[in-house]
From Swiss-Prot:
Protein name, entry field: Cytochrome b6-f complex subunit 4
Classification via InterPro entries: Cyt_b/b6_C (IPR005798), Cyt_b/b6_C_sf (IPR036150), Cyt_b6/f_cplx_suIV (IPR005870), Cytochrome_b_C_euk/bac (IPR048260)
CDD domains linked to this entry: cytochrome_b_C
Primary gene name: petD
GO biological process: photosynthetic electron transport chain
Length: 161
């Protein structure tokens, strides 16, 4: 079984000399306690909270158009995260084929770990097959999501052609 953590070789005299000077953490990783957990994380959390509260107070933007219970919109769109699947249902003429295509998405996601399992590298740039599949899936998802906001006749070309 492969090791998850890289432990330092404390018998190395060069590393021991660096550690005496307060250096050498990059050799085996900087310790999370107390550096990250006590100092960096609270600063990031407080900064994020301050940013969200500041934006909410300074610019209370409307989320969308006010609701009118007496007027039905021309096209009802789902939430933004459902745009790609909505676009598949909208574009594919056969609804059973649309359901099968949407069912293939989780199946494809389950197959991702097995695509390049023989490659032992963790760096994504040294795993070309997995990186290509990931980038292709991301681009198709973005293309379908953006196309769902267009009318049906322009949704596949995104209004470019």
């Amino acid at each position: 079984m492969a090791k998850v953590l890289k432990k330092p070789d404390l018998t190395n005299p060069a590393l021991r000399a660096k550690l005496k000077k307060g250096m050498g953490h990059n050799y085996y990783g900087e310790p999370a306690w107390p550096n990250d957990l006590l100092y960096i994380f609270p600063v990031v959390i407080m900064g994020t909270i301050a940013l969200v509260i500041g934006l909410a107070v300074m610019d209370p933007a409307m989320v969308g158009e006010p609701a009118d219970p007496f007027a039905t919109p021309l096209e009802i769109l789902p939430e933004w995260y459902l745009y790609p699947t909505f676009q598949i249902f909208r574009v594919v003429p056969n609804k059973l084929l649309g359901v099968l295509m949407n069912a293939s998405i989780p199946l494809g996601l389950m197959l991702i770990p097995f695509i390049e399992s023989v490659n032992k590298f963790q760096n994504p740039f040294r795993r070309p097959v997995a990186m290509t599949v990931f980038l292709f899936g991301t681009l198709v998802t973005l293309w379908l999501g953006i196309g769902a906001a267009f009318p049906l006749d322009k949704s596949l070309t995104l209004g470019l052609f």
